[in-house]
């Protein structure tokens, strides 16, 4: 008599995480393998001002950004961070090219970064790694998951 007990085959699943790219005001967006996507992301300008929906919370960072070369309706996403003079992140969020639309079809948008100490903000930087890819990890799916993943999103205290 042949008896089989549960499946114990090892699928050989491996997750890898991309290295975080060099942050800048203008960056070439890259995929999880570090290859350029043909898209440039740029912080056009920024200023400190109260958010119109929560003016009592004081100044926040209001910034404008642009994606050149992005596809209509879908495309990359990058982390935007307000930084101090030492390039330490004071507040970050992911901005999506698909949410950036301006006149004449250009991919421009604006967003807000809430920071604890707005007086310390020296600039807004973008991290070139495309954050729009959300493939399954080995932990989520040992058979079909794994492979390269974008770096962990930037957060407060990260040196960029």
Where are these regions (language model features)?
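Short, solvent-exposed, Trp/other aromatic-anchored flexible loops in extracytoplasmic proteins
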Residues: 84-146
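Hydrophobic beta-strand residues in large extracellular and virion-surface proteins
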Residues: 27, 41, 46, 61-67, ...
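Residues that cap or initiate secondary-structure elements
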Residues: 11, 33, 69-73, 86, ...
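Mature extracytoplasmic domains of secretory-pathway proteins
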Residues: 49-93
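Sec-dependent bacterial lipoprotein signal peptides
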Residues: 1-6
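Short structured motifs
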Residues: 45-51, 63-64, 95-97, 108-112
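Transition segment at domain starts
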Residues: 7-58, 139-159
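Short edge beta-strand segments in beta-sheet-rich domains
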Residues: 75, 108-110, 151
């Amino acid at each position: 008599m042949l008896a089989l007990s549960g499946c114990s085959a090892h699928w050989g699943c491996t997750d890898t995480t991309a290295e975080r790219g060099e942050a800048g005001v203008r960056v070439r967006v890259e995929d999880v393998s570090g290859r350029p996507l043909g898209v440039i992301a740029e912080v056009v300008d920024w200023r400190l001002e109260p958010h119109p929906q929560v003016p009592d919370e004081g100044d926040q960072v209001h910034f404008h950004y642009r994606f050149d070369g992005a596809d209509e309706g879908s495309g990359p996403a990058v982390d935007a961070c307000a930084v101090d003079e030492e390039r330490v992140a004071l507040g970050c969020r992911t901005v999506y090219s698909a949410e950036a639309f301006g006149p004449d079809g250009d991919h421009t948008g604006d967003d807000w970064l809430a920071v604890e100490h707005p007086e310390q903000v020296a600039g807004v930087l973008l991290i070139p790694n495309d954050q729009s890819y959300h493939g399954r990890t080995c932990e989520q799916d040992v058979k079909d998951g794994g492979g390269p993943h974008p770096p962990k999103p930037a957060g407060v205290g990260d040196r960029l």
